[in-house]
Amino acid sequence: MAKKLVRFDWAMKRILRHKANFDILEGFLSELLGEEVTIKQILDSESNKETEDDKHNRVDILVENSKDELVIIELQNSNEYDYFHRMLFGTSKAITEHIKEGHPYAEVKKVISITIAYFDLGQGKDYVYHGTTTFKGLHKNDVLTLSGKQVELYKKDNIYEVYPEYWIIKVSQFHNRVKDKLDEWIYFFKNAEIKNNFSAKGLKEVNERLDEIKLNEKDAKEYKRYLKNLRDIASEQHTKMADAQDLIKKGEEKKEIEAVVGLYENGVPIPIIAKSLKITEEMVIQLVESQINK
């Protein structure tokens, strides 16, 4: 049986910000981005400014890697309809806050935004999405590229490397079918466990350091409280969804009653009403009588 590990979002808040645990985040980023990633430092992020209402709902961490790129890793537990706008705001904020006043635009840092979403963000069949910026010709359909001088100055080969890059991992869309090493990480995000045959970078360290039974008494209590808050959020969302469905059902029932009574008052025979609305004749009689006896 796989050991019980702490959730990645809680680990991001409490454990992964320490330099001794950078190798865990480095492992995840290396598997996602397909290159070796070294973390230089953890920078201040929005998590430190969150309110009591949303601190259990969202966790984010801002990383600077050895290539001087900024990497925003954000984990979101529940739905926000304007979340795509939030992603844009986050990358824009990171750019403006990390360029010194009076310095040239060429010093604008590349930003990589990674969202680990535990809700159905947008509409799509996949569970990992990657977004970049390209410029395509309106008439020739060619892709705009950097000049030789720009490649030399920016140390980049393509225009999209200058602009923010977005990754979205839809954990709720992942069906536990592991096909590669990135899937091993997503399996951990969803299930808080690691299978014995997993070999993705960083997961060995996760297995060693994020073991739930290794938490000290204070952290164990806080972690239990954190899980309870997540359950409360999930329960509240379930209740809202059920209430919405009830309202829809009541609206449909009201329309059905109005249709039955309207047809009856216009002299349409009960058998024809029943056949037209695909209900029984007894139901038609009950609905008509319920309105007459009001």
Describe every region a protein language model picked out.
Residues 71-76, 180-294:
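Short, charged alpha-helical interaction segments and adjacent helix-coil junctions
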Residues 1-220, 225:
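Conserved single-residue anchors adjacent to enzymatic active/cofactor-binding motifs
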